[in-house]
């Protein structure tokens, strides 16, 4: 699962880089730059400033996911505010809200990480990597929580002469580090 691909970055390794932000982190650092990345699952984001509470499309869509059960309190309107109880919502209910909000005050963070699709996107910037001695940086969240994906992508990138870097706190099981060891050394 990933939540962003940032192209043309110059701050996360040598040269021009593309950063793949992966979801999932076992820490809860108060200074985290990407708190939306903590959950390895889809996350519901809400920007109250963009919300037109009168529209209530999110409330209606949520009610459909619970078959109109008024006791369920995942999303409800109280006075002129939308109240969200993320703990009361399943991942399927969160995904069902993906394109409901016309102002995008309510959005979903997280996309399924399909290796072939990600590789194709990451390779789009190959001319920039070649010119600047850049490459791809795996970040997050904690990228080593998805060691198979990171190892597979890094292997394919290396085969295409693209350097890789990993931003990690290393707070993962040692087997995850072992699985990614070759890419950590090869860079």
Give a label for each model feature.
Residues 38-181:
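Conserved Radical SAM active-site core
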């Amino acid at each position: 699962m990933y939540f962003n691909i940032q192209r043309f970055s110059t701050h996360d390794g040598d040269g021009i880089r593309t950063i793949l932000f992966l979801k999932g982190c076992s820490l809860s650092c108060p200074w985290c730059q990407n708190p939306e990345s903590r959950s390895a699952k889809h996350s519901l984001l809400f920007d109250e400033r963009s919300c037109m509470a009168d529209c209530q499309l999110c409330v209606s869509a949520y009610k459909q996911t619970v078959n109109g059960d008024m006791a369920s309190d995942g999303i409800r309107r109280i006075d002129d505010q939308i109240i969200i109880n993320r703990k009361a919502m399943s991942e399927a209910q969160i995904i069902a809200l993906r394109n409901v909000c016309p102002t995008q005050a309510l959005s979903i963070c997280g996309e399924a990480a399909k290796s072939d699709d990600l590789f194709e996107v990451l390779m789009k910037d190959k001319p920039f990597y070649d010119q600047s001695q850049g490459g791809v940086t795996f970040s997050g969240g904690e990228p080593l929580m998805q060691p198979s994906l990171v190892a597979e992508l890094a292997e394919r990138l290396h085969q295409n002469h693209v350097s890789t870097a990993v931003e990690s706190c290393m707070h993962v099981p040692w087997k995850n580090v072992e699985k990614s060891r070759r890419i950590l050394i090869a860079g």
